[in-house]
Amino acid sequence: MKKLELVLSIILFTLVLGVFLYTITPTLPFWDCGEFISCSYSLGVPHPPGTPLMILLGNMFVKIFFFIKEVALRVNLFSAFTSALSAVMLFLISMKVFRRVNPSPDRQEEIVNYATAFLTSFLASFLYSFWQSAVEAEVYNPA
C-alpha cells in the first residue's frame, strides 16, 4: 500500500497547491508580509527574533522564479508550496499513527484509514488561519 500512499500524497499536494495558487495574493499583502518579502529578496533580517530559514528558502524561491515579475508573488508562492507540503506531511503522519494503533488492519479498515487521513489533511488545509497564511508571505506555515 506504500504505492497508494505515494499516489494519494501527490494528489493531495496537487489539489491543495492548485487551490492555493488560485487564491494566492498576487502583490504585497498587509502586516508583516511586506517585511518578509523584502527580507527574502535582499537577505535582510526581519524584526526579532528573525526567521532565517524562511528568509533563506524564500530567497531561493525568488531566484528560482526569476521569470515572474512580481517579487511579492514569488515569495507568496513559497508560502503556498510549503503549505501544500504541510498538508502532505499531515497525511503521512496520520497514516503512521493509524498503523501504530492497528498494525494489521483488514482491507476495509485500511480503506477507511486512507480516506480519513486524506480528507482530514485536505480539509485542514482550508481552515481559515492556515489558508490565510498559505496565500501570503507569512512565516507560520513554512515553519
Residue ranges of model-derived segments:
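Specific aromatic-rich, kink-prone transmembrane helix
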Residues: Y41, M89-M95, F126, F130, ...
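Hydrophobic transmembrane alpha-helices of multi-pass secondary transporters
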Residues: L8, L12, I37-C39, V71, ...
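Extracytoplasmic catalytic/substrate-binding loops of multi-pass membrane glycan-assembly enzymes
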Residues: I24-F36, P46-M60, L73
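Aromatic- and kink-enriched transmembrane "portal" helix at the membrane-lumen/periplasm boundary
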Residues: T23, I68-N76, S104-N113, T120-N141
